[in-house]
Amino acid sequence: MVLETISKIIKTQLPAYLKKFPLPETIGGFARLTVLDWLRLLPLLGILTLLGYLTIRPFLPKKKKQKDSLINLKIQKENPKVVNEIDIEDLKSTNVCYCRCWRSKTFPVCDKSHIKHNELTGDNVGPLILKKKII
């Protein structure tokens, strides 16, 4: 089914398209093309542009991976790591650590990804620790 469709396009529709194709013989002939002629040229120009891009793409400069940026810009910068502990009476478990660096694979729970982030960037972000308040 697919091969029959491709065969029909190549054997029937493509030759019919190329017969009606308004390709001028000189460069100055492009200036004399009508709007309808330009519209007929658009699919071919699009395909040629795509093929040209795909050809030169391996030679284009690669984008550099952006360096991890700081998260904590001004809070307690004098401390090596900012960790806040909050006592809550109604907490079901004894301790819960929440991520504030947005790098945790178990987000929102902290998996200590901030340690690697802090080493790479020089940041001082740490987790938010919720403790069960002992009455």
UniProtKB/Swiss-Prot annotation:
Q: Which loops or segments lie on the Cytoplasmic side of the membrane, by the record?
A: 61-135
Chain coiled-coil ranges: none
Keyword Mitochondrion carried by entry: yes
As cofactor, the record names: [2Fe-2S] cluster
Check the record and name the InterPro entries matching this protein: CISD1/2 (IPR045131), FeS-contain_CDGSH-typ (IPR018967), FeS-contain_mitoNEET_N (IPR019610), MitoNEET_CISD (IPR042216)
Instruction: Name a GO CC annotation attached to this entry.
Output: mitochondrial outer membrane
What residues bind [2Fe-2S] cluster, as annotated? 99, 101, 110, 114
Q: Which residues lie on this side of the membrane: Lumenal?
A: 1-37
Q: What is this protein called?
A: CDGSH iron-sulfur domain-containing protein 2B
How the protein assembles, per its UniProt entry? Homodimer.
Does the record bear tRNA processing in its keywords?
no
Q: How is the cofactor bound?
A: Binds 1 [2Fe-2S] cluster.
Compartment(s) where it occurs, according to its Swiss-Prot or TrEMBL record: Endoplasmic reticulum membrane; Mitochondrion outer membrane
Q: Which residue ranges run through the membrane?
A: 38-60
The UniProt family comment states: Belongs to the CISD protein family. CISD2 subfamily.
Query: What is the protein's membrane topology class?
Result: Single-pass membrane protein
One MF annotation (Gene Ontology) recorded for this entry: 2 iron, 2 sulfur cluster binding
Q: Which organism is it from?
A: Oncorhynchus mykiss (Rainbow trout)
Summarize the protein's role.
Regulator of autophagy that contributes to antagonize becn1-mediated cellular autophagy at the endoplasmic reticulum. Participates in the interaction of bcl2 with becn1 and is required for bcl2-mediated depression of endoplasmic reticulum Ca(2+) stores during autophagy.
Q: Which SMART domains match?
A: ZnF_CDGSH
Name the keywords, alphabetized.
2Fe-2S, Autophagy, Endoplasmic reticulum, Iron, Iron-sulfur, Membrane, Metal-binding, Mitochondrion, Mitochondrion outer membrane, Transmembrane, Transmembrane helix
Q: Which GO terms describe its biological process?
A: autophagy of mitochondrion; regulation of autophagy
Pfam families documented for this protein: MitoNEET_N, zf-CDGSH
Gene name in the database record: cisd2b
